[in-house]
């Protein structure tokens, strides 16, 4: 029974009903029969009065209950606000936490004879805090096994470790020079300053190599993490692209020569050992630009991977292709270029240690390894060349690593690099002749391209016959010796003259550009004239436009150097005259001045 109404001095509904019934009974009992109608009327009136009082009491009770609920809600809200304010006051009065770095973890020990007390036996950690080294206790809520050296911890006002945090994410960048055991290392910082540092717990589980960049907290002397540097990432080994010898056109003899030199040692190592032969350490690919030197280098790496996987019976064996562009290695600081070269071969040896073949490809080799003593403004080659020589045939062996160099000025490379035993195989990548050009065209003009209906109808709807005819007519136009294809007239030092045609400066890159240009013409015809498909006329027009773009390219100031880069070797050239049929064909040629020596630079 709810007694809340008794607190207000009011009867409950049950009590009111009982009182009304008792009153009616007494009054009815007091009436002596015979009953009269007037007495009954009085009794009914009194009952109604009592009922009205009961309803009034019920309304008062409902109002009191509602007021009581509101009061309870207000009290609960006030209690929550009081608790919030109390917590805020406690937090404002709480002293700040401090940070420390773990130097050493001291688990609980059994007291030994002569020990100095609990400081040497209880669980504790040695930390750096505000430049001081201290031994502090650990809260029972903190698991000591989850802490590691170099890690940051949170300390309360009593300098008790109450929480373990992560590692500092900022610091000084240093270079690893030497490992000193498992937990220490010798590093080189700014101004070549060397110092011994400790390795953090997270860093002790990482495989570190000489030359790695580390983040150092100089306040505590801890190396915290390994940092990938941009200059190092540029030298990261790349997996070989999916390029095979079948993707290269017009270089059959050169590819066969390279396969004999590179693949035979992998296919028949027993025969090589029996005959006392060693695999070549390097290959030099030289020739004019755009003739496929880089493609061949990638195909060599792909082929080596396939042969190595076949020999090892492991189809998952990968090969790696490290593409190094000569100018990327040059650095204005003394010794940095040599360090980059050491890093390249260190990474190559690391990857090759598991049997994976690694190809180190130096593009534009003449820009980096020039003949010593030929520098005009510097002598950096006097230290760069010996560094490469020591890496190729030094004390450390290069197993499963082959060096491939590419250059269009092989006459500028230091002779010590070109001697047998270093770059053993030298392959000249010549400009394609008509047959080789047709082979290259066939790589780009394939039967899955859309061809014009008239061209297909001319050859009976045979797609392959249409492709063959397109290739044949385009090659004939490119290699024609008609007057319209005359390009240059060169005069040699002995007075002889020679007429050079566009075919003398053709390359695989030019062939690809001609096909791409023809495809763009086909797309433009489709958009403007609604005529879909590649036509022979597109290819012939592309040949003419491609040649005209090169009419101003010959360097008439230093024609001999320009001719050497373009692949024209032999007698020194003293005079060049452009013979292009067009706007530049009427311009007179220019002779060079021979009074000053400009060196090897153009």
Swiss-Prot record:
<dbReference type="GO" id="GO:0000502">
    <property type="term" value="C:proteasome complex"/>
</dbReference>
<dbReference type="InterPro" id="IPR022482">
    <property type="entry name" value="Proteasome_ATPase"/>
</dbReference>
<comment type="subunit">
    <text>Homohexamer. Assembles into a hexameric ring structure that caps the 20S proteasome core. Strongly interacts with the prokaryotic ubiquitin-like protein Pup through a hydrophobic interface; the interacting region of ARC lies in its N-terminal coiled-coil domain. There is one Pup binding site per ARC hexamer ring. Upon ATP-binding, the C-terminus of ARC interacts with the alpha-rings of the proteasome core, possibly by binding to the intersubunit pockets.</text>
</comment>
<dbReference type="InterPro" id="IPR041626">
    <property type="entry name" value="Prot_ATP_ID_OB_N"/>
</dbReference>
<keyword id="KW-0143">Chaperone</keyword>
<feature type="region of interest" description="Disordered">
    <location>
        <begin position="1"/>
        <end position="40"/>
    </location>
</feature>
<feature type="region of interest" description="Docks into pockets in the proteasome alpha-ring">
    <location>
        <begin position="601"/>
        <end position="602"/>
    </location>
</feature>
<dbReference type="InterPro" id="IPR012340">
    <property type="entry name" value="NA-bd_OB-fold"/>
</dbReference>
<comment type="pathway">
    <text>Protein degradation; proteasomal Pup-dependent pathway.</text>
</comment>
<keyword id="KW-0067">ATP-binding</keyword>
<dbReference type="Pfam" id="PF00004">
    <property type="entry name" value="AAA"/>
</dbReference>
<feature type="coiled-coil region">
    <location>
        <begin position="35"/>
        <end position="91"/>
    </location>
</feature>
<dbReference type="GO" id="GO:0016887">
    <property type="term" value="F:ATP hydrolysis activity"/>
</dbReference>
<dbReference type="InterPro" id="IPR032501">
    <property type="entry name" value="Prot_ATP_ID_OB_2nd"/>
</dbReference>
<dbReference type="InterPro" id="IPR027417">
    <property type="entry name" value="P-loop_NTPase"/>
</dbReference>
<protein>
    <recommendedName>
        <fullName>Proteasome-associated ATPase</fullName>
    </recommendedName>
</protein>
<dbReference type="InterPro" id="IPR003593">
    <property type="entry name" value="AAA+_ATPase"/>
</dbReference>
<comment type="similarity">
    <text>Belongs to the AAA ATPase family.</text>
</comment>
<dbReference type="InterPro" id="IPR050168">
    <property type="entry name" value="AAA_ATPase_domain"/>
</dbReference>
<dbReference type="Pfam" id="PF17758">
    <property type="entry name" value="Prot_ATP_ID_OB_N"/>
</dbReference>
<dbReference type="GO" id="GO:0005524">
    <property type="term" value="F:ATP binding"/>
</dbReference>
<dbReference type="InterPro" id="IPR003960">
    <property type="entry name" value="ATPase_AAA_CS"/>
</dbReference>
<keyword id="KW-0175">Coiled coil</keyword>
<feature type="binding site">
    <location>
        <begin position="290"/>
        <end position="295"/>
    </location>
    <ligand>
        <name>ATP</name>
    </ligand>
</feature>
<dbReference type="Pfam" id="PF16450">
    <property type="entry name" value="Prot_ATP_ID_OB_C"/>
</dbReference>
<dbReference type="GO" id="GO:0010498">
    <property type="term" value="P:proteasomal protein catabolic process"/>
</dbReference>
<keyword id="KW-0647">Proteasome</keyword>
<keyword id="KW-0547">Nucleotide-binding</keyword>
<dbReference type="InterPro" id="IPR003959">
    <property type="entry name" value="ATPase_AAA_core"/>
</dbReference>
<dbReference type="GO" id="GO:0019941">
    <property type="term" value="P:modification-dependent protein catabolic process"/>
</dbReference>
<comment type="function">
    <text>ATPase which is responsible for recognizing, binding, unfolding and translocation of pupylated proteins into the bacterial 20S proteasome core particle. May be essential for opening the gate of the 20S proteasome via an interaction with its C-terminus, thereby allowing substrate entry and access to the site of proteolysis. Thus, the C-termini of the proteasomal ATPase may function like a 'key in a lock' to induce gate opening and therefore regulate proteolysis.</text>
</comment>
């Amino acid at each position: 029974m709810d007694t809340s109404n008794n607190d207000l001095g009011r009867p409950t509904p049950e009590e009111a009903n009982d009182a009304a019934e008792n009153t009616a009974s007494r009054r009815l009992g007091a009436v002596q029969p015979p009953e009269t109608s007037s007495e009954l009327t009085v009794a009914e009136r009194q009952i109604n009065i009592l009922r009205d009082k009961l309803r009034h009491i019920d309304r008062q009770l409902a109002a009191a209950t509602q007021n009581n609920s509101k009061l309870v809600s207000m009290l609960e809200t006030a209690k929550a606000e009081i608790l919030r304010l109390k917590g805020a006051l406690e937090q404002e009065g709480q002293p700040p936490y401090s940070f420390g770095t773990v130097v050493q973890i001291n688990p609980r020990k059994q007291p030994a004879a002569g020990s100095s007390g609990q400081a040497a036996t209880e669980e504790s950690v040695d930390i750096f805090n505000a430049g001081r080294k201290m031994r502090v206790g650990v809260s029972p809520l903190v698991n000591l096994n989850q802490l590691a050296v170099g890690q940051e911890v949170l300390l309360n006002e009593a300098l008790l470790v109450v929480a373990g945090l992560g590692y500092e994410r900022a610091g000084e960048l240093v270079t690893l020079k030497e490992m000193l055991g498992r937990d220490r290392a010798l590093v080189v910082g700014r101004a070549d300053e060397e110092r011994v540092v400790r390795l953090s717990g997270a860093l002790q589980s990482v495989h570190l190599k000489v030359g790695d960049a580390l983040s150092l907290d100089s306040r505590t002397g801890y190396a915290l993490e390994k940092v990938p540097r941009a200059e190092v990432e540029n030298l990261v080994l790349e997996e070989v692209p999916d390029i095979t010898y079948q993707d290269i056109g017009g270089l059959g003899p050169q590819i066969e020569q390279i396969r004999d030199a590179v693949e035979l040692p992998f296919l028949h190592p027993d025969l090589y050992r029996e005959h006392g032969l060693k695999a070549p350490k390097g290959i030099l690919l030289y020739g004019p630009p755009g003739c496929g030197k880089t493609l061949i280098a990638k195909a060599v790496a792909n082929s080596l991977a396939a042969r190595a996987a076949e020999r090892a019976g492991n189809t998952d064996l990968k090969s790696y292709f490290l593409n190094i562009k000569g100018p990327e290695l040059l650095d204005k600081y003394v010794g940095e270029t040599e360090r980059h070269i050491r890093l390249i071969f260190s990474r190559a040896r690391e990857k090759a240690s598991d049997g994976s073949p690694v190809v180190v490809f130096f593009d534009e080799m003449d820009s980096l390894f020039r003949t010593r003593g030929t520098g005009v403004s510097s002598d950096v080659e006097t230290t760069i060349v010996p560094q490469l020589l020591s890496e190729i045939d030094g004390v450390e062996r290069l197993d499963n690593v082959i060096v491939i160099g590419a250059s269009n000025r092989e006459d500028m490379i230091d002779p010590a690099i070109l001697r047998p035993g270093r770059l053993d195989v030298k392959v000249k990548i010549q400009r394609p002749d008509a047959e080789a050009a047709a082979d290259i065209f066939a790589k780009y003009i394939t039967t899955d391209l859309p061809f014009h209906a008239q061209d297909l109808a001319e050859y009976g709807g045979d797609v392959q016959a249409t492709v063959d005819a397109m290739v044949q007519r385009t090659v004939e136009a490119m290699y024609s010796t008609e007057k319209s294809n005359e390009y240059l007239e060169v005069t040699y030092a002995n007075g002889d003259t020679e007429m050079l045609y566009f075919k003398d400066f053709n390359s695989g890159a030019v062939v690809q550009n001609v096909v791409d240009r023809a495809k763009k013409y086909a797309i433009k015809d489709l958009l403007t004239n609604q005529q879909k498909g590649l036509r022979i006329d597109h290819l012939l027009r592309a040949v003419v436009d491609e040649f005209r773009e090169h009419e101003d390219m010959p360097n008439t100031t230093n024609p001999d150097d320009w001719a050497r880069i373009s692949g024209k070797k032999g007698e020194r050239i003293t005079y060049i005259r452009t013979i292009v049929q067009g706007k530049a064909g009427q311009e007179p040629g220019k002779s060079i001045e021979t009074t000053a020596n400009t060196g090897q630079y153009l």
